[in-house]
Amino acid sequence: MANEQNEQAQDIQNEQVEQSNEQTQAEGVEQANDVTVESLQAQITKLEENLKLEKARTANAVYEAQKSVERIQRESEKHKETVLEKFAKELLDSVDNLERAIQAAGDEETPVLEGVKLTLKSLLTTLEKFGVVEADTQNGFNADLHQAVGIDPNAKANEIGTVLQKGYTLNGRLLRPAMVMVGQ
């Protein structure tokens, strides 16, 4: 009987220990849950901040890339214009030489002269395709388009009397001024 009472006492004590352990575990789980939720919320907040930062960096990188592309395109266009301008200026010497050859040939039409005229016409057509056109010398002297190199006594004031060398523009910009004699 004493053994039975000891066993019952021990069973009661074991139950109390188990209940105490369960209670402690439950409290620990609740605390763990509280800590876990708080730490997870902190992690979420931190990750959201990192995401915002990375989005801003990405947007900035995209913006910088677009600006670089635009800058490169502008520089490329400017370089293309510069190269075209240099090339056109060099071709104008050939145009001048062909015009001098036609003037030197006189009035007699020969097959060679006809060939030179066709070559000049072809060259001028090609130049026009790329925006090179002859500067206007019919509407009076314009300091933006013409370079006065002398006075023509037969011309009226501010009128162009003689054109010594034709001028040309490239896409509206002066490529070479016309060398002219102007009236007084």
Curated annotation (Swiss-Prot):
InterPro entries linked: GrpE, GrpE_coiled_coil, GrpE_head
Keyword terms, alphabetized: Chaperone, Cytoplasm, Stress response
Subcellular location per the Swiss-Prot or TrEMBL entry: Cytoplasm
A Gene Ontology BP annotation from the UniProt entry: protein folding
GO MF terms held by the record: adenyl-nucleotide exchange factor activity; protein homodimerization activity; protein-folding chaperone binding; unfolded protein binding
Gene3D superfamilies (alphabetical): 3.90.20.20, Head domain of nucleotide exchange factor GrpE (2.30.22.10)
Annotated spans, Disordered: 1-34
Keyword Cytoplasm: yes
Taxonomy, superkingdom: Bacteria
Cellular component GO terms held in the UniProt record: cytosol
Comp. bias regions, Polar residues: 1-26
PANTHER family in alphabetical order: GRPE PROTEIN, GRPE PROTEIN HOMOLOG, MITOCHONDRIAL
Subunit structure comment from the entry: Homodimer.
Function statement: Participates actively in the response to hyperosmotic and heat shock by preventing the aggregation of stress-denatured proteins, in association with DnaK and GrpE. It is the nucleotide exchange factor for DnaK and may function as a thermosensor. Unfolded proteins bind initially to DnaJ; upon interaction with the DnaJ-bound protein, DnaK hydrolyzes its bound ATP, resulting in the formation of a stable complex. GrpE releases ADP from DnaK; ATP binding to DnaK triggers the release of the substrate protein, thus completing the reaction cycle.
Family as reported in the entry's similarity comment: Belongs to the GrpE family.
Protein name: Protein GrpE
Species this protein is from: Acinetobacter baumannii (strain ATCC 17978 / DSM 105126 / CIP 53.77 / LMG 1025 / NCDC KC755 / 5377)
